[in-house]
Amino acid sequence: MRTLLVLCALVLAGCAGVPPTPVAPADLGLPRRVHITLQSPGEVRQDALLVVQAEGAHATRWSLFDPLGMPQARQILQDGQWRNDGFMRPNGQASDMFSAILFAWTPVSALPSAYPGDDWRDTATPDGGRERVMNELCGPRWRVTWRRGAPADTFTITTGGGATWRVEPLKDTP
């Protein structure tokens, strides 16, 4: 019985592990500014602004703000590891969301080198859109969908837990 409990704990730990990050960099066209609509089951929809910029040769800075401009998360991805930037408290949900957006932004041609192995797939959907899935031991971690005819930088990410993150570029207005 004890062995079974330990085995179950290990399986569950694998399902809630550190989000995957690319092992090889891809050209992301930085800096980027996007609007994110976050919706978790049973919670009120939230809007956020994400700014991503290069930080030296091998790092990117990810800054998430609420609609009033208050920082919600600031993290740096360097050598495949997330770390906090400044005095913000750790935010695991932000790391997961940032990793999912990075997965979506990675060009199809760069996926095999950035995410080696067979944990992901990128396919056309029957309605003419596109879908990209990152799997983990317990099923899909993220499902990225692009509607038919939608720009490549406008997509929706659905997590294994049912949360959705709608990502679209900020409109440049004078």
Residue ranges with predicted function:
Residues 16-20, 36-43, 49-51, 70, ...:
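Mature, soluble, non-transmembrane domains
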Residues 20-29:
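Short, low-complexity, disordered segments immediately C-terminal to signal peptides
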Residues 30-36:
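Short amphipathic
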Residues 11-14:
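C-terminal motif of bacterial Sec signal peptides marking the signal peptidase cleavage site
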Residues 78-81:
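Acidic/histidine-rich, surface-exposed loop or edge segments in extracytoplasmic proteins
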Residues 1-7:
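Sec-dependent signal peptide recognition
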Residues 56-59:
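Glycine/acidic-rich beta-strand-loop module
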